[in-house]
Curated annotation (Swiss-Prot):
It comes from Delftia acidovorans (strain DSM 14801 / SPH-1). This is Large ribosomal subunit protein uL11. The keyword rRNA-binding applies. GO terms for biological process: translation. GO terms for molecular function: large ribosomal subunit rRNA binding; structural constituent of ribosome. Forms part of the ribosomal stalk which helps the ribosome interact with GTP-bound translation factors. One or more lysine residues are methylated.
Length: 143
């Protein structure tokens, strides 16, 4: 018989830097899950990823206080900022442009994110990412 699911917990945790402090501790503690067990397992699974890169994680909590978790790809905005070496997006994206991104860079990001995106193919994913880039004040070339 399958375990009874108590709930899902969605967090963004820096790769390799999970610790019991907020937001992880309180979120897992409310469900009675072992916080240190999650931190150790998460850090072990994210060893190959660039340290500090924020990763969305979905934790499934079960009635017997056990859990499983799925690590997703980094947010599109983080990957776009990383591709064009940007610290933050524009405060006014319609007037202030902060950088340029090419279609090739967007395709590379799309290939990384495709399994977590709601897009049928790479071209649709590129168009979605181009919209995200524009909303950050980044000029999109070739899309």
């Amino acid at each position: 018989m399958a375990k009874k699911i108590v709930g899902f917990i969605k967090l963004q945790v820096p790769a390799g830097k999970a610790n019991p402090s907020p937001p992880i501790g309180p979120a897992l503690g409310q469900r009675g899950l072992n916080i240190m067990e999650f931190c150790k397992a998460f850090n072990a699974q994210t060893q190959g990823v660039e340290p500090g890169l924020p990763l969305p994680v979905v934790i499934t909590a079960f009635a017997d206080k056990s859990f499983t978790f799925i690590i997703k790809t980094p947010p599109a905005t983080v990957l776009i900022k990383k591709a064009i070496k940007l610290d933050k997006g524009s405060s006014n994206p319609l007037k202030n442009k902060v950088g340029k991104i090419t279609r090739a860079q967007l395709e590379e990001i799309a290939n990384t994110k495709l399994k977590d995106m709601n897009a049928a193919d790479v071209d649709a994913a590129v168009r979605t990412l181009a919209g995200s880039a524009r909303s950050m004040g980044v000029i999109v070339e070739g899309v």
